[in-house]
Amino acid sequence: MIRLLTFLYLIFINTVMGEEILFEDFINKPEKKWEFITDQVMGGISDGKVEFLSEDNKNFARMSGSVRLENNGGFIQIRKKLDFRINKNSKAIKIDVRGNNQEYYIHIRTSGTILPWQYYQASFIVSSEWETIDLNFANFKRSGVMLSKNINPKNIKSIAIVAYGREHKSFIDIEKIIIY
């Protein structure tokens, strides 16, 4: 019953108020909500792991590993499916992150991304210090011409943090993800 009331409350706040929605804070059993995926699903040899940690009163996910390009590979990611609907007027995603001074991506899948290789992506660079990065939905690029040019926030199905596209060591901590 509490779960249902929480769900209804989130929908109400998101739909009526149009305020910030906490997508993830890595406090309440994140290991049950996040999936670690590598290019091994398609024959690649990238490897890594996700850990859920706590340090200095911060709970966060740490994704680490090696991105390799052999066998048409080139990614590792953590992904979470949405269990609520985002307000169509939401404009951006905000993440609190730190890492190894490398470029990473957010991949968004919507009800229109039918094939496994379809997504919308935006890049960001992390530093070794915690920082907040804002990514406007209008700046996400579609992975192919078969997709609509723009993301309709109410159709978002999942959000992923991705190390992608070049050989490198991945090391990124994600403390919070907010949609607003």
What is each residue range found by the language model?
Residues 2, 16-180:
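Beta-rich carbohydrate-recognition modules and glycan-binding surfaces
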Residues 9-17:
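Hydrophobic h-region of N-terminal signal peptides that target proteins for export
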Residues 1-9:
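Sec-dependent signal peptide recognition
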